[in-house]
Amino acid sequence: MPDRTGPLLRTPAWRALEAHLAELQPLHLRELFARDPGRGERLVADGAGLHLDYSKQRVTEETVRLLVALAEARGLPERRAAMFRGEKVNVTEGRAVLHVALRAPRGERILVDGNDVVPEVHAVLDRMAAFADQVRSGAWTGFTGKRIRTVVNVGIGGSDLGPAMAYRALRAYAIRDLAFRFVSNVDGTDLAEAVRDLDPAETLFLVASKTFTTLETMTNAASARSWLLAALGDPRAVARHFVAISTNEAEVRRFGIDPANMFGFWDWVGGRYSMDSAIGLSTMIAVGPEGFRELLAGFREMDEHFRDAPLERNLPALIGLIGVWNANLLGAGTVAVLPYDQYLDRFPAYLQQLTMESNGKRVTASGTPVEGHGTGAIYWGEPGTNGQHSFYQLLHQGTHLVACDFIGFCQPLHALGRHHDLLMANLFAQGEALAFGKTAEEARAEGTPEPLVPHRTFPGNRPSSTILSDRLTPRTLGALVALYEHAVFTQGVIWDVDSFDQWGVELGKVLANRIVKELESPAEPALAHDGSTNALIRRYRARRGG
């Protein structure tokens, strides 16, 4: 019987991969392509409008076969089915994990504790659509009767990163007579700069907090309310300028928001998986209900692909499994996400939370320490071609092995002369350069002076994948996000970690709540931290002024 939750490194499937690595390790990508010139047309997969070329990864078809065998041995098909059925796969919190229900079509049945949640999802979507149409048309006015001109989303984590990324990604489809701003940091600078040039009478705040008690979000929301009331004077104005995305009606009412303007979601939606729930209200206002439905359709297409496609042709499974291969067997513990589209400039930051908060775990789902291997690769990146002039030097000639995901589109949203061909030429060139490099002989053949040959040599053999789609649309964005959501799930199953909790964020919160009282105390507090923290607190209190 397969061992689905035991130590990964002791499984026969893992040992088979280690034996395969010993055979493959000496082979450079140059040699792999020379031996098999057709791998660039075979080591590819398609789904939900996305094309994945993983032929420049340090894998062969045998590698993929062994990775699929590992996935089956670790129970990926069964765990995937359990998630789609609404079982409580978030084991540490005893919750279902059903972001897939947020994009399920009307009429589909998905049960949580015996209740079909799909009608509830569509009821919220319908309310969101009606409200978005009001704001977009000008039918929703502020307290003084002025039309809303700026929407400010106030949230943090998944309540900010997803909506902010989606707005920037879909600006080409956004309504142009509304401005959108996003406030997340408890640093007062974030809010102050966001509202500095706004007219309170024309500003609508969307406050996104499931409990309506999140420290950063509610601190910003309270300051935003004070800013509004300083200008408009009447507490009744709050009801026309604030909307809640929450499930805590009592706190929403206490804040001054009409519960009729509260949009809820469910405990089976994790924050970093929530951009297509009511958390995405700012996105719906920006691109309209129809654009949001297209976004959901892209999510759904990738959900169905992940659920139904064979693992060897399954995009999320391939990205997840090759990521495990790179991190745990090749030693590439970091992934550079490199979108060659300026609209996706916040996509790497979004993926940081999705991947690192999900799989950055040191214990298994059952609470035993992870044995002998890493989890949760470090994700980072910048849009191309900007990154080429900053950190690509390290990618090509540095001592760290960094796996790369290139993302590009065949059709530009703004066809300006040669711009798009130049952009895509750089994308293709970078993948080629990382894979094949430049030998010393090639450098000499170019006339490079001998003392410079070591500096002009590129080792190559740096793994990368390329994801191509025809055009960046709401639908392709949904598919792209769902691709990584399910890749994260795949890796969590292999590593046997709970990809849907985030206990690691708790300790800092508890300590901060204690320290803020010490910072605000009018009397000198009796500090009982370590020597460093005590000294820093005393220095801050002495020098903060005011």
UniProtKB/Swiss-Prot annotation:
Documented EC number(s): 5.3.1.9
GO BP annotation list: gluconeogenesis; glucose 6-phosphate metabolic process; glycolytic process
Database matches in SUPFAM superfamilies: SIS domain (SSF53697)
Pathway listed: Carbohydrate biosynthesis; gluconeogenesis; Carbohydrate degradation; glycolysis; D-glyceraldehyde 3-phosphate and glycerone phosphate from D-glucose: step 2/4
The entry's keywords: Cytoplasm, Gluconeogenesis, Glycolysis, Isomerase
InterPro entries: G6P_Isomerase, G6P_Isomerase_C, Phosphoglucose_isomerase_CS, SIS_dom_sf, SIS_PGI_1, SIS_PGI_2
Keyword RNA-binding attached: no
Protein family according to the UniProt entry: Belongs to the GPI family.
Protein name per the record: Glucose-6-phosphate isomerase
Gene designation: pgi
